[in-house]
Structure formats: structure tokens, C-alpha cells
UniProtKB/Swiss-Prot annotation:
InterPro entries associated with the record: ACT-like_dom_sf, ACT_dom, UPF0735_ACT_dom-cont
Annotated ACT domain residues: 74-149
Family: Belongs to the UPF0735 family.
Name assigned to this protein: UPF0735 ACT domain-containing protein SSP1116
NCBIfam families, per the entry: PRK04435.1 (NF003361)
Positions in coiled-coil regions: none
Species of origin: Staphylococcus saprophyticus subsp. saprophyticus (strain ATCC 15305 / DSM 20229 / NCIMB 8711 / NCTC 7292 / S-41)
Matches recorded under HAMAP family: UPF0735
Disulphide bond pairs: none
Lineage: Bacteria, Bacillati, Bacillota, Bacilli, Bacillales
Length: 151
């Protein structure tokens, strides 16, 4: 994958989002608050097809003012399994003045591994996109994805 082949994030007001995206956000909130509820039941409550829910559920995240004070997020990196790879990633994060909350490196399979990092960016003014781009340009990192943000 090309280092420039990544998704950029935007902050968008809810009133300009398509109805299906807004419904997806509401369904995610309902499912979060009531784990016993099935996806089928939740989408039925909001009159949304399951296919529309699945299309948007991993691409839309609620954000509010709390992100300014918290600045915690989790990334997953897809990397080649080479000696020193994790050290290179950690060095990059140190140079960006980020605090590492948790690290998990998967067992390498077929020369590939994933590194999941929970980070705290309160000590830097960098945006998440800047952090992701800095990690994308590290040799042997093929993909970087944002998987969660603490709000």
C-alpha cells in the first residue's frame, strides 16, 4: 500500500450529514448503552437497513469538546516483521513527545505483524493526522489506522 493511500479525517456538523450516517451514530450509542440489544433490533428502532449500518459503523465517530482535554487515541499499525521495528516506532513516538499508554504487538505471521498503540497527546499540539503521517513514513510500516479516541 502506498504511504499516501490513507483516509483523512474531518470534523463535520451533524446537521449536514446524511440521515443514514446520523442514524448509524445513534444506533452505535444505543448498542453501547445496551449490550444485550442486537444489531437487528437496533437498526429496526431507527428504520435503517443493516447494510447501511455496516457501511458506516467503522467510519463515523462522535466527537465533542472533551477531546481537547483528553487527547487519547488508539492506532493500529501494520508492519513488516523485521528486527528493530517496534523500537523504530517507539523512537518516532518519543520524538513527537507522545506518551504511550499501552502497546500490543501481535505474533508475526508470514513476515507481517500489527502493533496497537494507545497514546496520550496532551503534551503536544500535533493533530492525530500528523501523528499518523509520521508513523506512515517509518520504513516497513504499510498502514496506520485510527481505531478509537477517548472522549
Amino acid at each position: 500500500m502506498d504511504k499516501k493511500d490513507y483516509k483523512k479525517f474531518y470534523l463535520i456538523r451533524e446537521d449536514v450529514l446524511p440521515e443514514s450516517v446520523v442514524k448509524t451514530l445513534k444506533i452505535k450509542e444505543v448498542l453501547k448503552n445496551d449490550p444485550s440489544l442486537s444489531i437487528f433490533e437496533a437498526v429496526k428502532q431507527f428504520d435503517l437497513s443493516r447494510s447501511a449500518f455496516y457501511k458506516y459503523r467503522d467510519t463515523i465517530f462522535p466527537i465533542d469538546e472533551k477531546i481537547e482535554s483528553t487527547r487519547e487515541f488508539t492506532l493500529i499499525l501494520y508492519v513488516n516483521d523485521i528486527v528493530g521495528m517496534l523500537a523504530e516506532v517507539l523512537n518516532t513516538l518519543s520524538n513527537l513527545d507522545l506518551s504511550i499508554l499501552t502497546i500490543h504487538q501481535s505474533i508475526p505471521m508470514e513476515g507481517r505483524a500489527t502493533i496497537t498503540l494507545s497514546l496520550d497527546a496532551t503534551s503536544t499540539d500535533l493533530e492525530i493526522d500528523d501523528v499518523m503521517e509520521a508513523l506512515r513514513i517509518v520504513d516497513h510500516v504499510s498502514k496506520v489506522e485510527l481505531i478509537s479516541m477517548t472522549i
